């Protein structure tokens, strides 16, 4: 008897009876395993489970020891508690502070992973329903389409339908991971860290499925370095037109709105703009042929409340992720209808999915309902523009805005009693009382300066005893700068092409391109948006390859040089040294890890399928890269960063990120931790302490710069590469911290490693300060370095990769 597989069949001899079998239990997995056999070489961890990467994870965690920063001394997780875990005490269940802190961090990571995976599931199911499961994956000039999927599952999907198996794999593993959170399950902090790293790898699978599905189905730019430039900023909005604002991360519903606008010639009659990652993806829609874009980006998550308070939107449509919990309540104050288009965020609104569009418009126009849930995307596409057309003249006639008049502004300023409660409540510790004091004397520039630094959380307003609407006051003071707030950002180009990887791979591995700097994440910056611009510009000037995504990519586009050009206009969008490559929205972060993985797979010919440890070992030892999530706030940021860490890619976070409760920092003075194998013969070899962390925080962007440059040093750097990297690290430290690093000499293997412009000076210092023997006639180092340079050395942490093994 032939085996049953997925699909359907009918028994024709039975009258009026049809039996349809949608799925055979186990058939999908069997089919996936059969498919995997077609892929060729396979590593040892295809379809990895909770324990599959444990040996690799523990190897990482042995060098990069977890540094725990608990938020409090109690555990309130079950009804035995709350339990005091201070002073090495254990809770009633037996867990200690380390275990509880590990569990808390792990919970954040799997929450972020689940968020991206659920996004991917919703999007994948929808595009399969609309475009069919046989739609080919088209990501541009690439054969390695899904490096993260292939590494974790062994699969290499070529169609939308084939993406189901990796999606099901992620969902199954997430269920297993979530189970370990339950009381009476895992209690060892080190194993929570291992599971967190595994969850991070799953996150990049979920993100990858999400983005490849939408790039293929929605005709996004496909590995396109010339993806269109998009207007960004509140000053880019034409206030004479009705304004639709989309907020969230899942663009599926918004594409229907854009289709309706195009079919009904509305693109020049109304504005459509976005906040957060939906904004990026709506500007990528149908842009593969580089048509003139009309969708705009208002800004990042930090702009949500500011945009609502401005009164500019005539209707807001929300989907999922990074949507403020007060969007509806704040919008209701200003008669801005809110339409929820995704089951994950319904805001208590009435469901009108089955109602007639015109009847919904009438309900909203009359004020009978403040908005509704609309899950039928065909109706959503028609509903949103119709609401905007109806509400715009009504709201314009009433002049609705939360921004105070000149008279109200003065009254609010004079009400301040300088109690300082607002400053204490502010996550950024902004000196609001001082700014109000200056404003009372007629100097408004201090208030205006707070506009950019303010993250728009309104915590200050809730503690103000005088009930001053502080956010509105800040926005009033900054009206001129807001009206001029206009920049350019390159639309998300998707992944790096195989050809780009081949061309740039050698430079990255040898170190002649100093490194990949990935600037990603949320806008919870410690001192305003210009920090990420400053960091990006500094590294671009030094020929680093800068990759950006999400809110950080938006904020980088808000600043211009003296010639009025943004970084996106000044630097090419190519995957090469000195390139500024915007991959797109949050889910496109998978293409950043994917690029490092493709260097291993394409340039170094490493097997990707089911082979995470070997690929990660390669990136840790050979691919200079460092991530920056300077404003990280969400659980998704934790999972994205942890997914980078399992691949040996370090990440620097902003000062708020100590609240994630865990860092991974090595002890550079423990020399035994800095030994690896030489794959040529299995012998031990010393390596420099680089990277010296996998996850850490910095207090200022000036501190972050040299940290990131140092984190791009790799054991495999050739002399020219090491010299270039040392030059940048030492110069950045001197420029921004006022001192050269104390440990620069640890990275010198011979005189050719030294920065060329300072070689003689540094040789003198090595002789005087470190006691190294120098042949001054030949200007060569005779003795001193503990690390010997061998151009053919093959550093690896995996004994099984050594030839003797």
Swiss-Prot record:
Cofactor note: Binds 7 [4Fe-4S] clusters per heterotetramer. Binds 2 [Ni-4Fe-4S] clusters per heterotetramer.
Keywords linked to the UniProt accession: 4Fe-4S, Iron, Iron-sulfur, Metal-binding, Methanogenesis, Nickel, Oxidoreductase, Repeat
Domain 4Fe-4S ferredoxin-type, residue spans: 407-435, 445-474
Residues binding [4Fe-4S] cluster 1: 72, 76
Reaction(s) this enzyme catalyzes, per UniProt: CO + 2 oxidized [2Fe-2S]-[ferredoxin] + H2O = 2 reduced [2Fe-2S]-[ferredoxin] + CO2 + 2 H(+)
Residues the record lists as binding [Ni-4Fe-4S] cluster: 249, 277, 322, 522, 551, 586
List of residues binding [4Fe-4S] cluster 4: 426, 454, 457, 460
InterPro entries hit by this protein: 4Fe4S_Fe-S-bd, 4Fe4S_Fe_S_CS, CdhA, HCP/CODH, Prismane-like_a/b-sand, Prismane-like_sf
Pathway: One-carbon metabolism; methanogenesis from acetate
Pfam families on file: Fer4_9, Prismane
EC main group: oxidoreductase
Matching HAMAP family: CdhA (MF_01137)
NCBIfam families reported in the protein's UniProt record: cdhA (TIGR00314)
Purpose: Part of the ACDS complex that catalyzes the reversible cleavage of acetyl-CoA, allowing growth on acetate as sole source of carbon and energy. The alpha-epsilon subcomponent functions as a carbon monoxide dehydrogenase.
Domain notes: Cluster B is an all-cysteinyl-liganded 4Fe-4S cluster; cluster C is a mixed Ni-Fe-S cluster which is the active site of CO oxidation. Cluster D is also an all-cysteinyl-liganded 4Fe-4S cluster that bridges the two subunits of the CODH dimer. Contains two additional 4Fe-4S clusters, dubbed E and F, that probably transport electrons from ferredoxin to the B cluster.
Family statement drawn from the similarity comment of this UniProt entry: Belongs to the Ni-containing carbon monoxide dehydrogenase family.
Protein name per UniProt: Acetyl-CoA decarbonylase/synthase complex subunit alpha 3
Top-level taxonomy: Archaea, Methanobacteriati, Methanobacteriota, Stenosarchaea group, Methanomicrobia
Gene: cdhA3
């Amino acid at each position: 008897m032939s085996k049953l597989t997925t699909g359907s069949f009918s028994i024709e001899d039975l009258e009026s009876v049809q039996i349809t079998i949608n799925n055979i239990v186990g058939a999908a997995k069997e089919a996936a395993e059969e498919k995997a056999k077609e892929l060729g070489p396979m590593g040892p961890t295809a379809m990895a489970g909770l324990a599959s990467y444990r040996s690799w994870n523990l190897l990482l965690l042995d060098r990069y020891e977890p540094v725990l920063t608990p938020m409090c001394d109690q555990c309130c997780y079950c009804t035995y508690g709350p339990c005091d875990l201070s002073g090495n005490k254990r809770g009633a269940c037996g867990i200690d502070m380390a275990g509880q802190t590990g569990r808390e961090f792990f919970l954040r990571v799997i929450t972020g992973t689940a968020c991206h995976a659920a996004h991917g599931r919703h999007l994948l199911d929808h595009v399969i329903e609309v475009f069919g499961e046989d739609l080919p994956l088209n990501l541009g000039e690439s054969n390695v389409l899904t490096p993260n999927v292939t590494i974790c599952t062994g699969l290499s999907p070529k169609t939308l339908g084939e993406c189901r198996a990796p999606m099901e794999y992620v969902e199954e593993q997430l269920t297993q991971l979530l189970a370990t959170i339950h009381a009476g399950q895992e209690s060892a902090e080190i194993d929570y860290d291992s599971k967190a790293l595994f969850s991070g790898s799953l996150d990049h699978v979920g993100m990858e499925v999400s983005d490849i599905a939408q790039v293929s189905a929605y005709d996004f730019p496909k590995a396109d370095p010339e993806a269109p430039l998009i207007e960004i900023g509140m000053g880019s909005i034409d206030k004479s037109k009705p304004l639709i604002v989309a907020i969230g991360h899942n663009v599926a519903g918004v594409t229907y709105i854009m289709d309706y606008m195009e079919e009904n010639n509305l693109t020049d009659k109304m504005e459509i703009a976005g906040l957060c990652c939906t904004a990026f993806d709506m500007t990528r829609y149908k842009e593969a042929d580089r048509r003139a874009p009309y969708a705009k980006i208002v800004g990042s998550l930090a702009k949500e409340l500011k945009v609502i308070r401005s009164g500019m939107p005539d209707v807001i449509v929300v989907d999922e992720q990074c949507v403020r919990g007060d969007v509806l309540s704040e919008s209701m104050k200003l008669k801005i209808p809110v339409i929820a288009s995704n089951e994950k965020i319904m805001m208590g609104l009435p469901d009108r999915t089955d109602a007639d569009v015109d009847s919904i418009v009438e309900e909203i126009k009359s004020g009978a309902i403040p908005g509704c849930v609309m899950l039928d995307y065909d109706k959503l596409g028609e509903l949103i523009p119709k609401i905007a057309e109806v509400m715009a003249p009504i709201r314009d006639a009433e002049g609705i805005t939360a921004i105070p008049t000149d008279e109200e502004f003065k009254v609010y300023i004079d009400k301040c009693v300088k109690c300082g409660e607002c400053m204490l409540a502010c996550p950024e510790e902004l000196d609001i009382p001082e700014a109000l004091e200056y404003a009372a004397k007629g100097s408004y520039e201090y208030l205006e300066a707070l506009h950019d630094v303010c993250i728009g959380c309104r915590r200050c307003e809730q503690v103000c005893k005088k009930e001053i609407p502080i956010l509105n006051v800040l926005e009033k003071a900054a009206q001129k700068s807001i009206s001029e707030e206009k920049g350019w950002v390159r639309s998300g180009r998707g992944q790096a092409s195989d050809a780009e990887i081949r061309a740039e791979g050698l430079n990255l591995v040898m170190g002649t391109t100093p490194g990949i700097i990935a600037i990603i994440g949320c806008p919870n910056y410690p001192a305003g948006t210009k920090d990420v611009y400053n960091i990006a510009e500094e590294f671009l000037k030094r020929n680093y390859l800068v990759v950006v995504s999400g809110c950080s990519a938006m904020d980088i586009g808000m600043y211009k040089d003296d010639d009025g050009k943004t970084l996106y206009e000044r630097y090419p969008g190519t995957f090469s040294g000195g390139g500024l490559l915007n991959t797109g929205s949050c889910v496109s972060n998978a293409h950043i890890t994917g690029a490092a993985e493709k260097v291993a797979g394409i340039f170094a010919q490493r097997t990707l399928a089911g082979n995470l440890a070997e690929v990660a070992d390669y990136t840790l030892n050979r691919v200079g890269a460092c991530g920056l999530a300077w404003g990280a706030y969400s659980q998704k940021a934790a999972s994205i960063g942890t997914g980078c860490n399992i691949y040996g890619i370090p990440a620097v976070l902003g000062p708020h990120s100590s609240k994630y409760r865990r860092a991974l920092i090595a002890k550079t003075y423990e020399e035994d931790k800095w030994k690896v194998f030489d794959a040529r013969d299995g012998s031990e070899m010393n390596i420099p302490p680089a990277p010296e962390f996998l996850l850490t925080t910095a207090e200022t962007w000036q501190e972050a710069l040299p940290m990131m440059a140092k984190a791009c040093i790799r054991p495999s750097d050739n002399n020219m590469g090491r010299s270039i990297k040392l030059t940048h690290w030492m110069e950045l430290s001197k420029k921004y911290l006022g001192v050269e690093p104390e440990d620069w000499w640890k990275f010198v293997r011979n005189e050719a490693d030294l920065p060329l412009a300072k070689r003689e000076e540094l040789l003198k210092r090595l002789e005087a300060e470190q006691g190294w023997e120098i042949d001054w006639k030949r200007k060569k180092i005779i003795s001193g370095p503990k690390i010997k340079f061998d151009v053919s050395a093959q550093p690896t942490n995996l004994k099984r990769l050594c030839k003797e093994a």
